[in-house]
Amino acid sequence: GVSVWLDGPGTAFVDLLQFYDISPQVSTTVVDGGFAVHVENFIVDGEVRYTLDGRDPNAEDEIYAGPIRFDHTATVKCAVFKGGEALASAEVVLHKHDAIGRPPELTSPYSPKYTGGGNGALVDGVFGSGYFNDGFWQGFVRDDLEATIDLGKVVELHTVRARFLQNVRSWIWLPTDFEVYASEDGKKFWKVGAVENEVPIDREGELVEEFA
């Protein structure tokens, strides 16, 4: 929390208190099947340093000088330093998989209120949190979600995973089931797996479930 106090001999009249988030803003894009991480700094004369191995950055780590490019799963942590001291930080976890850079074809549109970042959000490697309005979840209203992903070539897959959110107080529920179909020509499909949801429809809280 934040505490504010005024030290003075008499009565103080306060009209407005404003607080600003000085944390660096991190955004990601998919480039050539890999990731590009962009960092925006709001601290004057601050210096952004980052790591890709999950460590908290220190004053000796790599200086951010432009988009950070890589093509593997990584936890990107960045911090703004000034005078050798870390003043603010941010992080993002990116997961590499075979559908990176392959936006799905959807039979039903996603909600304009919950785009998750656009057409490639379902396969961009960024996981949503437990908060439905964090900007990373893509929402579908009433219609079933059916997504077809063209990997560009025949690929041997061992696992297909999808993450879903339930928050009954916000009228968000997990799917009743998750089915996976495969095709070699994009025309003839056969079922290769299915998972039924076992979470009660009335279970409250912010639930993130992975179906595989």
What are these regions (language model features)?
Residues 11, 16, 20-21, 128-195, ...:
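Aromatic, loop-rich ligand-recognition surfaces of beta-strand-rich domains
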Residues 22-145:
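Short, compositionally stereotyped local motifs that mark structural "simplifiers"
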Residues 1, 75-77, 159:
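Short, conserved beta-strand segments of beta-strand-rich sandwich/propeller modules, principally
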Residues 54-63, 190-204:
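Solvent-exposed beta-strand/loop surfaces of large extracellular or lumenal domains
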Residues 3-9:
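Short beta-strand-plus-loop segments that form exposed binding edges in beta-rich domains
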Residues 1-2, 212:
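Noncatalytic modules at the cell exterior or secretory-pathway interfaces
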Residues 3, 49, 77-79, 148, ...:
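Residue-level detector of beta-strand face positions
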Residues 6, 80-82, 184:
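Short acidic, glycine-rich loop/turn motifs
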